[in-house]
């Protein structure tokens, strides 16, 4: 038996925090109260808070969970949902990151691959992650696996292959599918392609979670697209990090909430999550037009080295921008690290 002594308990119910002791036997709490004398191993929690484990429903710790990293558990997070925003570590193949720009966030070895969910979960078990992990299957990763970085609709055979692989991943424990519809190749999928995949997920009891196609000028249309998938398939819909990007679009939040309430009245099972702060985090490539990313990072660099292409990319980027470049701050780069902490306007002035 163990006792957590003199801690401040915050139980998540909204009740006022209280100071108390907690008795533990095995993996269970057996009593809560004041126990001045008890035969148990004592853990001194003076000046510490005791809380239920936090569930981080929108995490990108897919790779870190395989590295026995302790940052999350030290912040009270005991369970995480990974595979968000259209990219997961499975199904993958060597050099997938060259086809999927968003995949570079994981900093994986180019030779690494996880053919399916089972391969990833087996790796998790052997590496003994500190947190419990539930993983979505990334629709962008899935699409790159069967079609590469090409634009356009999946052909009939590619669709069959994608559905088979998705069904297998769900049977192996994936909890649903995620999209990252303002990142390629996820963005190349149209509504009908997404519905085809969502139907497979719904049959297996999973959910559809979406990094929407747009959070700026086409925010309302992007939300409506996700809700339509819920209407037509019956699948539960999770709207990821719901936000209106750019001051010109802030007023749209009220309109979006009206759309969501209307969908709920129609029977759509819809929920949302949001940042607890005023900044978002993404790769800088999300600022670029989708066509410039077709073919992956190698093709993007080739286009940027072409003066005419670079001019067109700059013009299209400006046309779709909702914030000033002073609002975009570099938080991490592998080279020229002196740029970390500077905004894009400052970097442009330096260059």
Residue ranges and their predicted role:
Residues 1-37:
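N-terminal metal-binding scaffold of metallo-dependent hydrolase/deaminase domains
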Residues 98-111, 290-299:
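Acidic, Ser/Thr-rich peripheral helices and adjacent loops at domain boundaries
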Residues 7, 22, 27, 47, ...:
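Divalent metal-coordination and catalytic microenvironments
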Residues 121-124, 129-132, 136-156, 162-183, ...:
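Active-site neighborhoods of metal-dependent hydrolases
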Residues 76, 204-205, 234, 267:
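Glycine-centered short loops/turns at secondary-structure junctions
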Residues 85-94, 106-225, 229-232:
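Hydrophobic, small-residue-rich alpha-helical packing segments that form membrane-like cores
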């Amino acid at each position: 038996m163990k006792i957590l002594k003199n801690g401040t308990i915050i139980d998540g119910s909204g009740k006022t925090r209280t100071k108390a002791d907690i008795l533990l036997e095995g993996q269970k709490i057996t009593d809560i109260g004041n126990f001045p004398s008890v035969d148990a191993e004592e853990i001194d929690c003076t000046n510490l808070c005791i809380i239920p484990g936090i569930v981080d429903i929108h995490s990108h710790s897919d790779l870190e969970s395989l590295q026995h990293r302790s940052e999350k558990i030290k912040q009270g997070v005991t369970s995480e949902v990974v595979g968000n925003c259209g990219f997961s570590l499975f199904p993958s193949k060597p050099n997938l990151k060259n086809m999927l720009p968003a995949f570079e966030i994981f900093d994986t070895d180019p030779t690494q691959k996880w053919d399916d969910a089972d391969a990833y979960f087996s790796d998790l078990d052997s590496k003994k992650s500190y947190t419990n992990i539930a993983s979505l299957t990334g629709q962008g990763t899935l699409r790159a696996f069967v079609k590469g970085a090409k634009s356009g609709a999946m052909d009939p055979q590619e669709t069959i292959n994608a559905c088979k692989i998705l069904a297998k991943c769900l049977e192996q424990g994936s909890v649903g599918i995620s999209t990252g519809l303002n990142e390629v190749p996820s963005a190349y999928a149209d509504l009908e392609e997404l519905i085809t995949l969502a139907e497979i997920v719904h049959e297996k009891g999973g959910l559809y979670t979406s990094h929407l196609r747009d959070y700026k000028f086409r925010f309302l249309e992007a939300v409506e697209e996700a809700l339509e998938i819920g209407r037509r398939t019956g699948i539960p819909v999770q709207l990821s990090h719901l936000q209106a990007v750019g001051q010109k679009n802030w007023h749209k939040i009220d309109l979006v909430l009206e759309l969501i309430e209307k969908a709920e009245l129609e029977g759509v099972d819809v929920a949302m999550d949001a940042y607890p702060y005023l900044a978002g985090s993404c790769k800088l490539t999300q600022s670029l037009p989708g066509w410039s990313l077709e073919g992956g990072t190698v093709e993007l660099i080739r286009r940027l080295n072409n003066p005419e292409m670079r001019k067109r990319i700059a013009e299209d980027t400006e046309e779709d921008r909702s914030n000033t470049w002073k609002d975009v701050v570099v938080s991490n780069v592998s080279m020229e690290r002196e740029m970390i902490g500077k905004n894009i306007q400052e970097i442009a002035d330096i260059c």
